[in-house]
Regions:
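Short leucine-rich amphipathic alpha-helical surface patches
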Residues: 181, 197-199, 215-223
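Structured catalytic core of nucleotide-sugar glycosyltransferases
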Residues: 187-189
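Predominantly the C-terminal beta-signal and adjacent terminal strand-loop region
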Residues: 122-128, 145, 206, 218-247
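Short, glycine/acidic-rich beta->alpha junctions
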Residues: 12-14, 96, 100, 207
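C-terminal outer-membrane beta-barrel translocator/porin domains of Gram-negative envelope proteins
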Residues: 41-183, 192-195, 199
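A short alpha/beta connector and helix-capping loop motif
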Residues: 204-216
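Gram-negative/organellar outer-membrane beta-barrel architecture
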Residues: 1-81, 150-151, 155-162, 166, ...
Length: 247
């Protein structure tokens, strides 16, 4: 059970999530089957725009496969992570809905490690709903920020709402290419290009691009990343700091 209260891109939400799951780890694949319940209040502060309360009771299944040689400094390997879920019609839910989301990444380092590491990442998701306004925003998608499309503020890519807010959308697509080149034993430089969008469907998407460079410090505790990126859409330069590897 978890309770989360947050305001991001001028969207305020309070969400309670609980459920029961059966977890199984077999042949390196972690799978989960369960029943989840989400209830959420959403509004845009200082406006009359109140999305009210929505809730969803969903049967969910998720799979995760991770085959990375060294997690503290990934050089070769891949990860796959997917989740699907659906309500039983509108039973204990604001509306009938189904959701699918997945992310994946691939790391490749040539035998001559001085060449560096090439990384490809991707994310995709979609929510089908009978009544779109009744879907909890926690189940929909926004993107932008250090873990998705760099060069943009956190969750700033989505549907434009009132008072400068950014509201979540039903479809998500994100891709990233990165090259890391060694500087010292524990330090690497990086160049990258990210792209992505969140829209009502995939046909309506207009990819937002971000290009930049950064530094990676592979400490004994966790990797530390500092990036500077240019957001092509709004023509601004932003910096990002993150701790840990993006799995």
């Amino acid at each position: 059970t978890s309770y989360n209260r947050s305001t991001t891109q001028n969207l305020e939400k309070r969400a309670l999530t609980t459920g029961i799951w059966r977890v199984r780890d077999r042949n390196g694949i972690e799978s989960r089957l369960g029943l989840e319940f989400i209830t959420e209040d959403r509004k845009v502060p200082d406006t009359n725009y109140d999305l009210g309360r929505s809730h969803a009771t969903m049967l969910t299944a998720s799979w995760k496969r991770q085959n990375i040689e060294t997690e503290l400094r990934p050089e070769n390997g891949y990860y796959l992570d997917g989740k699907i879920g659906a309500t039983l019609g509108s039973l204990f839910s604001s509306t009938a809905m189904a959701r699918a989301a997945a992310k994946a990444g691939y790391f490749f380092t040539p035998e001559n490690k001085k060449i560096g590491t090439f990384i490809v990442r991707g994310q995709a998701g979609y929510v089908y709903a009978k009544e779109g306004k009744e879907v909890p925003s926690s189940l929909e998608f926004r993107t932008g920020g250090a873990s998705s499309v760099r060069g943009y503020e956190l969750d700033s890519i989505g549907k434009a709402g009132p008072n400068g807010s950014v509201l979540p959308e039903r479809a998500l697509l994100v891709g990233s290419l990165e090259y890391q080149f060694p500087l010292t034993k524990s330090l690497s430089g990086a160049v990258f290009h990210d792209m992505g969008d969140a829209a009502v469907n995939f046909k309506k998407m207009t990819m937002k691009h971000g290009t930049g460079l950064g530094v990676r410090w592979f400490s004994p505790v966790a990797p530390f990343a500092f990036d500077i990126a240019y957001g092509h859409q709004d023509k601004k330069i932003r910096w990002h700091i993150s701790l840990g590897t993006r799995f």
